[in-house]
Amino acid sequence: MEGTLLPLFAVLLSSWSVVGDPEGPPNVDGAPPSKIAVVGAGIGGSATAHFLRQHFGPEVQVDVFEKGEVGGRLATVTVNHNDYESGGSIIHSLNLHMQEFVKQLGLKYRRSVAGKTAVFNGKEVILEETDWYLLDLFRLWWRYGISFIRLQMWVEEIMEKFMRIYKYQAHGYAFSSVEELLDSLGGSGFINMTRRPLSDSLLELGVSQRFIDEVIAPVMRVNYGQNVSIPAFIGAVSLAGAQNNLWAVEGGNKLVCSGLLKIANANLRQAQVNAISPIQSGEALQYQLSFTTAAGTGSELYDIVVLATPLQASVGSGVQFQGFTPPFDQLPGNYHSTVATIVHGYLNTSFFGFSDPRLFPFASILTTETPDLFFNSVASVCPVNISAGFRRKQPQEAGVYKVFSPQPLDKSQLKTLFRSYYSVQVTEWQPYSHYGSSQGLPPVELHPNLYYLNGIEWAGSAMEMSSVAAKNIALLAYHRWNRQTDMVDQRDLMHRIKTEL
């Protein structure tokens, strides 16, 4: 989403309780691990490999298993010889890990192409962005009073506290659970935000119900495909999509993943991991990974394993845990299904109340929660490579559009949104947790030296959140391996860091 509908929030984070004893057994002789496995080569897995290399040094072997494409949900589709983002497409200016990755890899920021946003309620456009910032602010005030100011103050307070994570990680501190991390940043207030509906929190702030219905709900729908009953902390992350200061990587965001694997000198294993089993040899504990490649089946032993792929049954990771005592329970919760449809065609602007497409000024249309609406958003999208002379197609021209919807669009629905079209490409994702389908947050530590990254997605899903979780797990794995307990789950870190300086 582009524009100034809200001056809002982005950012990050991670996971729940420990299964087993996180600190035992120790590495026996003080030697570094010889082999580490990362399962999953999306942004979380790629960043984990990078950070593991930073902390464990050049000698350790880092293998990254990926059954599909590197980049995971940072995927692209091709239309008329141009690639377009079909997955994760925006990054916030305060996403410091992602910014550092781009700098280290020598990648470039994609040139921004201006475009206005509007909100549609199924009958008419009820809120629209103009070329005049002051006019937009006046309209917000006229329609919603000071709700947007109250929201901005709330968001700024959250951001100020949450940005502490970068300082903590720069000083090497790690957390064994999301509760510990949240508590260190914002105390019980942050933890409670993961349990309380966004709508309740906003109403308590004095934000009007109308503002929630017409501004907040559309942002939730486009970013997570869900409504304002999602937890408040997740809602704050989602509101990042309403900011101006967003960016993307020239050539596609997935280039970050392949680049991180390269500079980490990681071995990419194109394989499906089928099973993980603990192997005890004296006091030493290793994990046997059984996997399938195009050439057949195999297995290898690893000292440390990081799972950077969702483990919930609804996603179908294919990973089984064998021989663990006690046995692993199935991780609770489901992932939310959403459909990204990339259409090359002519937008039916009359559906939105503009009979003449030349008078349709919007690049993005968000929607309110209306029973008859079959889509969450539709937007004119730009290719991942933007030339100096590129301009966004006008509505009377054939353009490339991305439609988010809860279900695949049938022909009649496509005909409703488009006067005609040349091509349709459909990607069905399970990109986000279905918030409210699980009580509590998944663990970071499944077993000694066995870590789970994707529990972060139950606190909020974004590229930077996965990157923060990756850094946390790399630090946690390093400190656990080396018995540096004073670097894990420490209290009053801001004061402690000040005294270290």
Where are these regions (language model features)?
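N-terminal Rossmann-like FAD-binding beta1-loop-alpha1 element of flavoenzymes
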Residues: 27-63
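Glycine-rich FAD pyrophosphate-binding loop
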Residues: 53-79
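Conserved FAD-binding subdomain of flavin-dependent enzymes
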Residues: 73, 81-113
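Mobile amphipathic helical/loop "lid" adjacent to a hydrophobic cofactor/ligand pocket
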Residues: 103-104, 108-227
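Helix-loop-beta segment of a Rossmann-like dinucleotide-binding subdomain
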Residues: 175-189, 217-264
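Helical element adjacent to the flavin cofactor pocket in flavoenzyme catalytic cores
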Residues: 234-304
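C-terminal segments that line or cap access tunnels to active or ligand-binding sites in enzymes
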Residues: 299-304, 309-486
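Active-site-proximal substrate-binding core of FAD-dependent oxidoreductases
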Residues: 478-501
